[in-house]
Design a protein with these regions (language model features):
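A membrane-topology feature that recognizes alpha-helical transmembrane segments
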Residues: 1-155
């Protein structure tokens, strides 16, 4: 099954979002709400354009992508910014790409988590675990890049 082509502006916007989110997550362990809100607004405008992916597809993908990782937030394993980042990425990729994106991000996150656990394998208190939480924006970026490489039509 091949996925429908995604407009170049969506890939460009997603790439810029992920670069800025990774930078902020690594530097401050936060993904700023204004970044996500501006990108979500741009994603909705892109979706509504005649060549866009469609508002219904975009909104459904945001629910799928954000909802897929919501249990990890509820268990305290991810931050709210990571969930909002996934939902915003969903707005940009639409359905059915959001399903493949979630799988790619989950696999990248699992591999990064193994490396993170190996690096920080000393026993820690609960407060130290919170301060030493893995910046999941990196996993979202790597998973998105992997997804893009697997699904982009190359000549």
């Amino acid at each position: 099954m091949s996925l429908p082509a995604l407009p170049v502006w969506n890939w460009t916007t997603l790439s810029l979002l992920l670069l800025l989110a990774v930078w902020q997550d690594l530097a401050h362990r936060r993904i700023p709400n204004p970044l996500l809100l501006c990108t979500a607004s741009a994603a909705l405008v892109l979706a509504a354009m005649p060549q866009g992916i469609g508002l219904v597809s975009s909104l459904a993908a945001a629910l799928v992508a954000g909802g897929a990782f919501l249990p990890l937030y509820l268990l305290g394993q991810m931050g709210a910014g990571d969930i909002k980042l996934m939902a915003t990425a969903g707005l940009l990729v639409g359905m059915p790409r959001a399903l493949a994106l979630c799988l790619s991000v989950a696999m990248a996150g699992g591999l990064l988590a193994l490396g993170w656990a190996w690096q920080t394998r000393k026993p820690q208190s609960a407060s130290a675990r919170t301060a030493n939480r893995m910046p999941y924006a990196v996993a979202v970026a790597l998973g998105s890049a992997w997804h893009g490489l697997l699904t982009l039509p190359f000549p």
